[in-house]
Amino acid sequence: TGLNLNEVQKAQLVTDLAPFTVASITPVVVDPETLNIILNVSFKYDTNATSSTKEAIESLVSKTVTSFNNDNLKVFSSVFRHSQFTGLVDDADPSILSNITTVSLGSLYTPNTVGSYSFTINFGNALYNPHSGHNSASGGIIASTGFFVSGNTNEMFFDDDGVGNLRIYYLVSGVRTYFSSAAGTVDYATGLISVSPVFITTVSNVDGNISSAIRFTAIPSSTDIVGKRNQILEIDTLNTTISGNQDTIAVNSGGGSSTFTTTPSIASTSSY
């Protein structure tokens, strides 16, 4: 997706565009925002139909993910079409019989660490909220990587209560303890998270690396994802998981139903 323009370059671009604009319209150059798509691909395959190992077939599916990312996403106005993607996964190897692919969204935000500020995270897609208070006790459908706030030594995280309130919590012996139960709002219909003023001093590592940004994740209401306005869709291949499992019914000519396992079609809440 390349590097963003600096302020001098943006000003020069506005100047260059001036002769071509309508008199009453002033162009504004905005940075693109990457909306990450995090996938959990679980496929069933018939071991009688292939001599390849599970790992080899998983590698083929991984290549399919990379190709789909490069061929269909990473540009403006792109759409992640779930059925198109899952069809390509099924076609990655003749032994693959089906797949369940869940979808989560991720967005990075770099906080201003010199004072208390409000900010927004716009996923641009409706978020999963099948009923009021959904999954409140376990953190709703919003998650984040860690951060620290002024005056407190605990590592903090964001979640939601399922009724539109963003919360900040820390863990005590693995139990969520809420620093704030009204840290902002979540508009499930639009995917907009509004964070109330908070003084974030430092952020935790992301994906095992030193980071200046917090990653917010959310579960969308649809598995079809659209990039709106300045959003660019991109599959997060680092946090996407791919796992193959033997189809016990196919292998046992219909007699393996007692050991056949199914995969949930809704993503689990995770900060990755």
Per-range role (PLM):
Residues 1-72, 76:
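Carbohydrate-recognition loop of C-type lectin domains
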Residues 134-179:
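Structural flexibility/helix-modulation signal
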Residues 2-3, 47-51, 72, 91, ...:
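Short beta-strands and strand-coil junctions in structured, solvent-facing domains, enriched
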Residues 45-47, 125, 218-222:
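Beta-strand elements of well-folded, non-transmembrane domains
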Residues 163-164, 171-272:
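Surface-exposed interaction regions enriched in Ser/Thr/Asp/Glu
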Residues 35-39, 99, 115-117, 210-214:
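Residues at beta-strand starts and edge strands
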Residues 29-30, 55-140:
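An aromatic-glycine-centered, glycine-rich loop/turn in mixed alpha/beta architecture
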